């Protein structure tokens, strides 16, 4: 089996980008260690702090954020970083070539119940000149690499550099990420969907109708039965989609009119959309392809519908759109 470093060499990924990806992977090993120790290390539970989104921070949110910040500052290739746990972008090195956006611990509400959590990251090119928030506001099509690390029964890294999606598994003895799936592929059709049903009454009418038709199964207009899955961590739900197909959605809702969307574009939706498209799936807000969105702020939120291409098309048809053409990977 190839190690991650060997794989990057075989894919002709340039040295500086390879170095950055390896830094993120090495840091995820340390995060995996902290997650596994849990209560034994006193890292569970919440703090009295809130992040910029007004969410109460877990102890591990802060710990993992600091671990990634420290590693990226020491890497030498990073111009700046943006994190879910940071109010503003952070300047790292004036000589850096890359910008890194990340969610250090996606699904952190799961940590106290020993359920799935993960790290999501996106790598963008840095431009010359002063580093500002605007430097980061690039469409998802500009991503040079993206991935996530899933901390579950085994620790897994899903990665794309624009050459498909590869899956690596952390070997518990050698502490190396080894290539275990060289070409992850999302089936075009599915009978699984993932959505937070507790918000049903707050969704837009197209989404309510779409889900209602799925629930009708064989006796409804879809004429087949569907199963619902929900992990309450985007990283876990998207991993399932990449592994065996499905559709994952966190749609627009009016539960809080000031916050109609849940997921963040720059460090959740964009990297996951890049992975999904590279694996043959599709990703949309319901009205726009996610990777084509021009961001307006670093913590911008969007609706997300992603997964098996035919099922995403079916969902979008309820929104009055036809996305039957294959997405551009340029």
Swiss-Prot record:
Cofactor note as given: Binds 2 magnesium ions per subunit.
Subcellular localization(s) per the UniProt record: Cytoplasm
Give the main localization category: cytoplasm
Q: Which cofactor does it need?
A: Mg(2+)
- For this protein, what is the EC number? 3.1.3.11
Record GO terms (molecular function): fructose 1,6-bisphosphate 1-phosphatase activity; magnesium ion binding
Q: Which cellular components does GO assign to this protein?
A: cytosol
Pathway connected to this protein: Carbohydrate biosynthesis; gluconeogenesis
Q: Which GO terms describe its biological process?
A: fructose 1,6-bisphosphate metabolic process; fructose 6-phosphate metabolic process; fructose metabolic process; gluconeogenesis; sucrose biosynthetic process
Record's catalysed reaction(s): beta-D-fructose 1,6-bisphosphate + H2O = beta-D-fructose 6-phosphate + phosphate
Q: Which residues bind substrate?
A: 106-109, 196, 262
Protein residues bound to Mg(2+) 1: 84, 103, 105
Question: Keyword set for this entry?
Answer: Carbohydrate metabolism, Cytoplasm, Hydrolase, Magnesium, Metal-binding
* Secretion signal, residue range per the UniProt entry: none
The domain of life for this entry's organism is Bacteria
Q: Which PANTHER family match?
A: FRUCTOSE-1,6-BISPHOSPHATASE-RELATED, SEDOHEPTULOSE-1,7-BISPHOSPHATASE, CHLOROPLASTIC
User: Which family is this sequence assigned to?
Assistant: Belongs to the FBPase class 1 family.
Q: Tell me, how does this one assemble?
A: Homotetramer.
Q: What is this protein called?
A: Fructose-1,6-bisphosphatase class 1
Source organism of the structure: Shewanella putrefaciens (strain CN-32 / ATCC BAA-453)
């Amino acid at each position: 089996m190839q190690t991650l470093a060997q794989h990057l060499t075989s894919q002709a990924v340039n040295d500086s980008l390879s170095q950055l990806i390896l830094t993120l992977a090495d840091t995820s090993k340390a995060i995996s260690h902290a997650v596994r120790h849990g209560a034994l290390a006193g890292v569970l539970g919440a703090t009295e702090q809130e992040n910029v989104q007004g969410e109460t921070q877990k102890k591990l949110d802060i710990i993992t954020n600091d671990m990634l910040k420290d590693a990226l500052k020491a890497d030498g290739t990073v111009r700046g970083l943006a994190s879910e746990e940071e109010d503003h972008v952070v300047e790292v090195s004036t000589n850096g070539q890359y910008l890194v956006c990340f969610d250090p611990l996606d699904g952190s509400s799961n940590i106290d119940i020993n359920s799935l959590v993960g790290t999501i990251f996106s790598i963008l090119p840095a431009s010359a000149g002063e580093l500002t928030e605007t430097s980061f506001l690039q469409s998802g099509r500009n991503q040079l690499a993206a991935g996530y690390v899933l901390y579950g029964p085994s620790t897994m890294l899903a990665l794309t550099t624009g050459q498909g999606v590869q899956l690596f598994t952390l070997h518990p003895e050698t502490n190396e990420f080894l290539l275990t799936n060289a070409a992850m592929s999302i089936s075009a059709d599915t009978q699984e969907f993932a959505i937070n049903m507790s918000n049903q009454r707050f969704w837009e009418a197209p989404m309510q109708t779409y889900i209602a038709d799925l629930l009708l199964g064989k006796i409804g207009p879809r004429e087949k039965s569907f199963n619902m899955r929900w992990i309450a961590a985007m990283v876990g739900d998207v991993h399932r989609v990449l592994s065996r197909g499905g559709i994952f959605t966190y749609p627009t809702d009016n539960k809080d009119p000031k916050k109609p969307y849940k997921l963040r574009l720059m460090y959740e939706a964009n990297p996951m959309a890049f992975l999904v498209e590279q694996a043959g799936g599709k990703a949309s807000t319901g009205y726009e392809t996610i990777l084509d969105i021009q961001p307006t702020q670093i913590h911008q939120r969007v609706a997300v519908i992603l997964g098996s291409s035919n099922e995403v098309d079916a969902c979008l048809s309820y929104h009055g759109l036809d996305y039957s053409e294959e997405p551009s990977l340029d």
